């Protein structure tokens, strides 16, 4: 029985949503095709007819997750708001819906070209978003890169440690340090 175009589009969207969630929760290599199809409520055939391979699915799911994250964070009016949301205990606990970069950065270097390219595009998009929220005197791509690297590193560490107090301190210290750093005028020289 053939599936209508509308139903095929719904199936594709469902697979992307579930794959993005599972990849963030378990890693790219920690999720098999069986788990992906079961979570989406579809067959192996529908997955392969839509994407052709797990790598292509991972590439598209990564892009899909980044768009969803970007939409969720787009209502942050200030950089402080963006940092506060990203460095919160709620965000730390939302592995399946949280930061793709913190969830997958350690795995991406071992992936294929397409996945790495998609991840690189995501980094550029987040840097652009962060830069757009920076005060005029601090706006620079390098400053935005430092902010995202700090936040991804902090969230990764906060998720990795088994001590809840230390995890909270990592998030809190990062929020305070970034707030302090970003409230100062940019210096003309690098020290």
Residue map of PLM features:
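Amphipathic, non-transmembrane alpha-helical scaffold segments
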Residues: 8, 62, 116-124
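Alpha-helical bundle regulatory/interaction domains
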Residues: 65, 78-90, 111, 115, ...
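Helix-turn-helix
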Residues: 10, 14, 18-56, 60
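Amphipathic alpha-helical segments that line or abut small-molecule/effector binding pockets
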Residues: 17, 80-92, 106, 145, ...
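Hydrophobic alpha-helical connector segments
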Residues: 60, 67-98
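Amphipathic alpha-helical segments used for helix-helix packing
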Residues: 81, 92-120
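Hydrophobic/aromatic-rich alpha-helical bundle segments in the mid-to-C-terminal region
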Residues: 112-121, 133-191
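N-terminal intrinsically disordered/low-complexity leader segments
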Residues: 1-10, 184-191
């Amino acid at each position: 029985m053939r599936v209508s175009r509308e139903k095929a589009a719904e199936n594709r969207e469902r697979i992307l949503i579930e794959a993005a969630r599972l990849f963030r929760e378990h890693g790219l290599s920690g999720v098999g095709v069986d788990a992906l199809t079961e979570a989406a409520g579809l067959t192996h055939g529908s997955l392969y007819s839509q994407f052709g391979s797990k790598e292509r699915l991972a590439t598209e799911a990564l892009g899909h997750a980044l768009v969803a994250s970007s939409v969720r964070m787009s209502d942050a009016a200030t950089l402080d708001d963006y940092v506060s949301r990203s460095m919160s205990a709620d965000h730390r606990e939302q592995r399946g819906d949280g930061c793709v970069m913190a969830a997958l950065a350690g795995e991406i270097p071992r992936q294929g070209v397409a996945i790495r390219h998609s991840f690189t595009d995501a980094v550029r998009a987040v840097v652009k978003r962060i830069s757009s929220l920076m005060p005029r005197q601090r706006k620079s791509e390098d400053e935005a890169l430092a902010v995202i690297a700090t936040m991804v590193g902090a969230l990764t560490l906060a998720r990795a440690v088994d001590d809840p107090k230390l995890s909270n301190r990592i998030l809190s210290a990062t929020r305070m340090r970034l707030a302090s750093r970003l409230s100062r005028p940019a210096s003309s020289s690098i020290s």
